[in-house]
Amino acid sequence: MKPVYVVELIEDVVAKVSTALLPQLQVIDPAITAVHYQHGHPKEIIETLMQKDKSETYQFRKYPLIALFQDFPEAHNLQIGIDNEATLHLVIVNSTRPDYKAGERYVKNFKPILYPIYLEFLKQISLSGKFLNYGIHTLGHTKIDRLYWGREGLYGSEGNVFNDWLDCMEIRDLKLKINLINC
């Protein structure tokens, strides 16, 4: 039995999301070059994005981004046909402006960019064959729309989590059963 790398399975899904949505996203923002992907510890992801800021080539090729946060558990419960069940924590982020109000964020970021990426991400997971599921509506998870994504405090966000101004869809506890037959 060969090892299954969840981070690579998600990378493949994000590549398909990018292929499916890029023309639609470029109508909204011609500067979008892809739906980008990173995985790792949140601090590492932030450092990588900061390094891109120093590059003329990559400083504007960061968003939209799907980031898979590590570490995540993989339960190996010896179910026939299942390699493991991974419980994932991801974010889908896009750059924004700090002066936008909630309504503007939905009109300019959430509805045209973040929600289509979110829905296509779930669709591509469902279609991939790498995960045991029965359609998009059986992928249990918690989704949080984070307008001006910052650290949580008593009165909401108290600063940027990343160094950029971002709107975010946070996906917590996405449970994916890795289909051993197709991996």
Range-by-range predicted roles:
Residues E47-F72:
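Low-complexity, acidic Ser/Thr/Pro/Gly-rich terminal tails and inter-domain linkers that flank the onset
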Residues M1-P42, R61, D71-C183:
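Charged, amphipathic alpha-helical segments and their flanking helix caps
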